[in-house]
Amino acid sequence: MYFTMYMCKFHQLLVAAMAAMSFTCAQAQSTLPSSINEASATAVMQNIMTRTSVRKFKQQPIEDAKIEALLRAGMAAPTSNDMQPWHFVVLKDQKSIEKYAASNKYHAEDIKKTPLFIFVCADTTRMGEGQGKELWVQDCSAVSENILLAAHAMGLGACWTTIYPIQKKVDGISRTLKLPANLIPLNAIIIGYPDEPLEPKNKWDEKKITYGIPE
């Protein structure tokens, strides 16, 4: 109920923002009709605001076309100096998933029930030297958020499960997936068709915002 009220408020703000955008577009003689701009912005914002983490899935395989679409969405993410330091390991066949499950005694049964794993990894050979060599964390995080949003847009559920920077997990996953030394797993995104409806959380908090520079 509270989230519904929150979404109504969000919609009111979006309408106001779109009105301002329509005015700006008109000034700039935009080639796109305002109705297209408004519909597109509404769909994008609705997708962002209604996404939530899903951990329980139907035993239904995900179509290859959707898997490729998820990976394409990930690779469309922003990247420092266009390094594109990402590499993906995809587990979609039951044999591979069961191999992965066998390496994790605490979550083996849940792993077996997950239709798709996308491990987002960093290829350290594509990064620079000095402080810049750690920028892969930001790049691969942007990749991961794109995948989460794309999954939601396609009617799939997904959840980011952390690997890096927990070294024990990094080492264990690297051994299980037989990753070469230049690949570092950031996370495993678990994906499937949701087994139950989940209501997104309202995370809005004005106290976490500072406008301007204090005197």
For each feature predicted by the language model, list its residue ranges.
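Bacterial N-terminal signal peptides
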Residues: V15-S22
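Acidic, surface-exposed loops and disordered segments
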Residues: Y6-C8, C25-E215
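Intrinsic structural disorder/low-complexity segments
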Residues: L14-V15, I189
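Bacterial N-terminal signal peptides that target proteins for export
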Residues: F3-L14
